[in-house]
């Protein structure tokens, strides 16, 4: 946590978070009673100025947001120390105050659907796919592969062409439905605008019962293939925890599991615009994709790299198979673990890094798929209930 050190006052140390909770200190900063030269370091005083600006707005500010703001201020200070080439900015003060206010307004302007998605607590280890309606009714779907289809007005929902559910829709009130797909199951959803989404195992999709007049927006945690109905006047937005994708009409795969360190987007056809953070505090970065490309966004370094790929290698899970091209055993195990809802343990990090290429038929069991891999790699399997252990094959003698 950033510490603000004041000269005098027996070397008392003020932490940055104290600025948010100490109204008297905030008022002193606002009214100029604490002078800049009372702080040991100009940069840290500026951090206090930024926190003061947040406090003066009197907007509720959660602990996670405080910590995120603290860390991003520290990062910006360190970058400024390393590189003082901002000729267009009059001083470090104006630079960092601008940075802080930009962060503050970014943090407090998350979309309604993101805020709503954060309240959903359904787990991915359930035995059922859960359809959560806006009226708090929850429908449990037992099928391993299920289909959900909405009518144009969002009031009628068909489930696997057998069950029909009706819900009330109020024209002027935004209401959301949520589908939570557990590990071991998949779901196909046709939304009220006729866009189709294939949700992979362990995924959550939040979407409006009926889209607003000016925007189509959904929230994804997990992996899904989107076939978006074209509508140039109403762009389709997919929001994740770390990225937003804007499309007009296209087919793409988005893999954004919370426990993964990267967000992968593969564009099969059409055009999308990626909106993401890239180590910059002056707003998000935007980058367009063309068909046949994979965009990998590294959440740790906030960097995005694109490369040309065979898109079928990334979308084939929808059709019941996987195509591996020098994929690590560790990444394959994670995919299979989610798909089949089994635990897969690999003996060592070294073994997890070995690669495999080939075709995997997902109509077979997890053990059968891994057995095929073991025939082509120097590994052996041990299975107990829903746990599969992979280890290096022991040589006789």
State what each model feature region is.
Residues 1-12, 16, 26-124:
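Membrane-interface anchoring determinants
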Residues 82-91, 97-397:
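A residue-level detector for the "anchor" residue at the start of short, highly conserved motifs
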């Amino acid at each position: 946590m950033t510490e603000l050190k004041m000269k005098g006052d027996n070397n008392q140390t003020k932490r940055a978070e104290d600025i948010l909770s100490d109204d008297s200190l905030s008022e002193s900063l606002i009214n100029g009673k604490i002078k800049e030269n009372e702080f040991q370091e100009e940069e840290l005083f500026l951090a206090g100025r930024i926190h003061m600006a947040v406090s003066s707005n009197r907007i509720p500010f959660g602990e996670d947001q405080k910590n995120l703001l603290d860390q991003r201020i520290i990062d910006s200070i360190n970058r400024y120390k390393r590189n003082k080439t901002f000729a267009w900015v009059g001083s470090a003060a104006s630079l960092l105050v601008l940075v802080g206010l930009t962060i503050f307004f970014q943090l407090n302007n998350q979309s309604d659907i993101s805020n709503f998605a954060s309240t959903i607590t359904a787990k991915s280890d359930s035995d059922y796919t859960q359809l959560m309606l806006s009226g708090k009714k929850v429908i449990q779907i037992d099928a391993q592969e299920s289909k959900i289809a909405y009518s144009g007005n969002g009031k009628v929902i068909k489930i696997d062409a057998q069950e029909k559910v009706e819900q009330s829709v109020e024209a002027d009130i935004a209401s959301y439905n949520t589908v939570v797909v557990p590990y071991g199951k998949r779901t196909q959803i046709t939304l009220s605008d006729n866009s189709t989404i294939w949700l992979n195992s362990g995924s959550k999709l939040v979407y409006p019962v009926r889209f607003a007049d000016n925007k189509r927006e959904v929230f994804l945690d997990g992996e899904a293939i989107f076939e978006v109905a074209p509508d140039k006047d109403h762009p389709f937005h997919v929001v994740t925890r770390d990225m937003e994708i804007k499309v007009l009409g296209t087919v793409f795969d988005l893999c954004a599991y919370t426990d993964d360190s990267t967000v992968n987007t593969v564009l099969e056809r059409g055009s999308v615009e990626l909106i993401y953070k890239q180590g910059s505090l002056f707003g998000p970065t935007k980058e367009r994709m063309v068909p046949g490309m994979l965009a990998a966004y590294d959440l740790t370094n906030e960097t995005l790299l694109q490369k040309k790929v065979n898109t079928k290698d990334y979308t084939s899970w929808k059709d019941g198979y996987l195509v591996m091209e020098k994929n690590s055993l560790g990444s394959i195990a994670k995919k299979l673990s989610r798909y089949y809802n089994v635990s897969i343990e690999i003996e060592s990090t070294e073994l997890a890094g070995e690669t495999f290429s080939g075709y995997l038929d997902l109509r077979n069991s997890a053990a059968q798929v891994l057995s095929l891999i073991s025939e082509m790699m120097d590994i052996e399997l041990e299975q107990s209930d829903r746990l599969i252990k992979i280890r290096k094959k022991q040589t006789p003698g």
